[in-house]
UniProtKB/Swiss-Prot annotation:
A GO MF term: phospholipase C activity
Protein name: Non-specific phospholipase C2
Classification via PANTHER family: NON-SPECIFIC PHOSPHOLIPASE C2, NON-SPECIFIC PHOSPHOLIPASE C4-RELATED
Upper lineage: Eukaryota, Viridiplantae, Streptophyta, Embryophyta, Tracheophyta
Signal sequence range: 1-23
Organism for this UniProt entry: Arabidopsis thaliana
C-alpha cells in the first residue's frame, strides 16, 4: 500500500470517527441554569390552565393544619403568589414532615400533606402557610409562560435529595452530594471531593465554562479549584454576551445568577425573599442572548431549580427503588441512605430541536423500571449527547432518566422560535435591603470566599468569618475574593506550577475586608 493511500484511509477513519461521535445529536452546546428554592406547583402548577396535559393544579389541592386531627381545617392551594418573605422551611427534617406529615417515612406513595402543618410550626400567624399554599398565575411569570408554550416542560422532575440547596446542587454536576444532607459550612468551604461531569468533559477534550456574577457556587466542588481550570471561569457581565455573539460558548456552559440582593444589582436567583421579577429578567436575558447567537441551532438550554424551598407540591416524591449514588450514608442523627428523592421542581428545556408545547412526563421505565428525572439526569444526558466514553459518575446518574429523545424528533431545527420573550412583571414593592444580615446560603458563599482568599486562617472558622456581615458587605467580600483567587491561579500557572494542584492563597497576602 502506498503512503498516499494509507494517508487517505487514515483521513477517512478520522472522519468516520468524528461523524460517529456527533451524528446522534445536533446539540453541540449545553447551557445549564439552576435557580433557587421553588416547587413545580408554586412556579408552574397553574400552567395547566394553558395546557391540560401538564400535571399541575386546579385549586382542589389542600393540606390540613394538623395532619393527626381528622377534623382539622384545610387550606386550599391558590394562585395568589407574589413577593415571599420570610423563607419557608426546607431542611431535611422539615421536608420529611412536608412529605409524610410525620416522622414515619414508611408510606408509599407519601401523602404530601404536611406543608401547612410544618409552616405553622415555624410561623403560627399563618402567613407562611398561606405563602406555601399559593402558586403564580402564568401572567405573573410571563417568561416561563412563553418558554413552556414554545418548548418543553418536565412535569415529573424531582430534586435529587430531600434536603436543602447545596446537597442538591452537588447532584447537578456530579450525581452525588458525597453524603451531605445539609448545608455543612466546613465541608462546603473545604470543597467536596467527588468526580464531576466537568472532569469527564475535560478528559475527553470537550470545553466547559462557568459564567458567574457574585461568586460561582460550583467552587464547592474541590476539583474545580485546580489551577488547570482557572481559565474556565468568566464574568457573566463581561463575557457571556460577547462569547455568545462570537459563537464561542463552551460545549458545557454553566450560568450562575446574582445571589446577593443589593440596590444596584438585585439578586436574580429566585431564592426567597428575592424578587421573582429579577429571576424572570435574568432568564429572559439568557434566552435572548442564546437565541441571537450563531450557536443557537446547536444549543440546548436547561433551566431547573435546586429544590422546592418549602413550597407545596401535590405529586408524591419517589421513595422506593432509588439507588444510593455511592453507598455513603448521611451523618447523624438521620443516617440517610439516599434512597428517596426530593420534591418536584420546575424544569424547562429550550432548543430549536424541541417541538412547541412539549410536555415531558416520566422517563417511561428507562434506563431502569424505577428511573426518574432528577438532577442527575443532567450529567447522564450530557454523557449521551456528547457520547462520552467515561463511566457514569455514580450509580445515581446511571439510573436517572435521560431526555435526548425530545431532541431527536425533528429532522431540522425550528425557524419560528421567538427572538424575544415577554417583559416580566414587577412583583416586589420597594427595593432590596442590602443592609440585611446574610442568609444561611449567603453565609456559605462568604465562607467559600474566605477559603479562596486565604482568610479562613485569620479567625475561628467557619462561624466568625461572616458574623455580622451585611448583604452589601458580603457581596463586596466575595467578589474581591474571586478576583484574587483567579489572579493567584493565573500567576501560579505563569510560574510553571503543576496544573493539577489547587489554587492556594496565603493569608499574609490578603485582608479580611476588601
Amino acid at each position: 500500500m502506498s503512503i498516499k493511500a494509507f494517508a487517505l484511509i487514515q483521513l477517512l477513519s478520522v472522519t468516520i470517527l468524528y461523524n460517529h461521535v456527533h451524528a446522534t445529536s445536533p446539540i453541540k452546546t449545553i447551557v445549564v441554569v439552576v435557580m433557587e428554592n421553588r416547587s413545580f406547583d408554586h412556579m408552574l402548577g397553574w400552567m395547566k390552565k394553558l395546557n391540560p396535559e401538564i400535571n399541575g393544579v386546579d385549586g382542589s389541592e389542600s393540606n390540613p393544619v394538623s395532619v393527626s386531627d381528622p377534623s382539622s381545617r384545610k387550606i386550599k392551594f391558590g394562585s395568589g403568589s407574589h413577593y415571599v418573605d420570610p423563607d419557608p422551611g426546607h431542611s431535611f427534617q422539615a421536608i420529611r414532615e412536608q412529605v409524610f406529615g410525620s416522622n414515619d417515612t414508611s408510606m408509599d406513595p407519601p401523602p404530601m400533606n404536611g406543608f401547612v402543618q410544618q409552616a405553622y410550626s415555624e410561623d403560627p400567624s399563618g402567613n407562611m402557610s398561606a405563602s406555601v399554599m399559593n402558586g403564580f398565575e402564568p401572567d405573573k411569570v410571563p417568561v416561563y409562560k412563553s418558554l413552556v408554550s414554545e418548548f418543553a416542560v418536565f412535569d415529573r422532575w424531582f430534586a435529587s435529595v430531600p434536603s436543602s440547596t447545596q446537597p442538591n446542587r452537588m447532584f447537578v454536576h456530579s450525581g452525588t452530594s458525597a453524603g451531605a444532607t445539609s448545608n455543612n459550612p466546613i465541608s462546603l468551604a473545604k470543597g467536596y471531593p467527588q468526580r464531576t461531569i466537568f472532569d469527564n468533559l475535560d478528559d475527553e477534550e470537550f470545553s466547559f465554562g462557568i459564567y458567574y456574577q457574585n461568586i460561582p457556587a460550583v467552587l464547592f466542588y474541590q476539583s474545580l479549584r485546580k489551577l488547570k481550570y482557572v481559565f474556565k471561569f468568566h464574568s457573566y457581565g463581561n463575557s457571556f454576551k460577547d462569547h455568545a455573539k462570537q459563537g464561542k460558548l463552551p460545549a458545557y456552559t454553566v450560568i450562575e445568577q446574582r445571589y446577593m440582593d443589593t440596590l444596584l444589582e438585585p439578586a436574580s436567583d429566585d431564592h426567597p425573599s428575592h424578587d421573582v421579577y429579577q429571576g424572570q429578567k435574568f432568564i429572559k436575558e439568557v434566552y435572548e442572548t442564546l437565541r441571537a447567537s450563531p450557536q443557537w441551532n446547536e444549543t440546548l438550554l436547561i433551566i431547573t431549580y435546586d429544590e422546592h424551598g418549602g413550597y407545596f407540591d401535590h405529586v408524591p416524591t419517589p421513595v422506593r427503588n432509588v439507588p444510593s449514588p455511592d453507598g455513603i450514608v448521611g451523618p447523624d442523627p438521620f443516617l440517610f441512605q439516599f434512597n428517596r428523592l426530593g420534591i418536584r421542581v420546575p424544569t424547562i428545556a429550550v432548543s430549536p430541536w424541541i417541538e412547541k408545547g412539549t410536555v415531558v412526563h416520566g422517563p417511561n421505565g428507562s434506563p431502569f423500571p424505577s428511573s426518574e428525572y432528577e438532577h442527575s439526569s443532567i450529567p447522564a444526558t450530557v454523557k449521551k449527547l456528547f457520547n462520552l466514553s467515561s463511566p457514569f459518575l455514580t450509580k445515581r446518574d446511571e439510573w436517572a432518566g435521560t431526555f435526548e429523545n425530545i431532541l431527536q424528533i425533528r429532522k431540522e431545527p425550528r425557524t419560528d422560535c421567538p427572538e424575544t420573550l415577554p417583559e416580566p412583571v414587577k412583583i416586589r414593592m420597594g427595593e432590596a435591603n442590602e443592609k440585611a444580615l446574610l442568609t444561611e446560603f449567603q453565609q456559605e458563599l462568604v465562607q467559600l470566599a474566605a477559603v479562596l482568599k486565604g482568610d479562613n486562617m485569620l479567625t475561628t472558622f467557619p462561624k466568625e468569618i461572616s458574623k455580622g456581615m451585611t448583604v452589601i458587605e458580603g457581596k463586596r467580600y466575595m467578589e474581591d475574593a474571586m478576583k484574587r483567587f483567579l489572579e493567584a491561579g493565573r500567576m501560579a500557572l505563569s510560574m510553571g506550577a503543576n496544573k493539577e494542584e489547587l489554587v492556594h492563597m496565603k493569608t499574609s497576602l490578603t485582608g479580611r475586608r476588601p
